[in-house]
Amino acid sequence: MTNVSYDPTRELYKEYNEAFQKHYKEQTGKDIRIVQSHGGSGSQARSVIEGSRADVVTLALSYDVERLQRAGLIDAGWEQELPDDSAPYTSTIVFLVRKGNPKGIRDWNDLTKDGVSVITPDPKSSGGACWNFLAGWSWCLDHFGGNEI
């Protein structure tokens, strides 16, 4: 069995696959070999569309899953599988600061302070970067009601 997924899930699936292998053996009496393939979400989607073997595919962005649907690899309506058209994952955004946190960064609003720079991956090439931007946008909607500041 080949599990194709995006980069940050490597450790999660290593543990999950080991638990699944044990469960499968208990249920069927047979061993199952699971091969992991990890890369950027868009690259993984493209690879599967172009014919790479995949029994299980998990991607970071709904856009990449939609590409699989358009290629005829999954049925329409996949987004309704979970309540509120949600994803089966959560992401935690972490602010890394200099030792001692000299600029007092504690929340999204602190990122607007003079002299604060933000470094994040390019959302065109990183699913995690898209989630970073969406988390910031969500924070703004919650705190400013969609009004510009």
Give residue ranges: language-model regions.
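Helix-loop "lid/cap" segments that line or gate small-molecule binding pockets
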Residues: 135-142
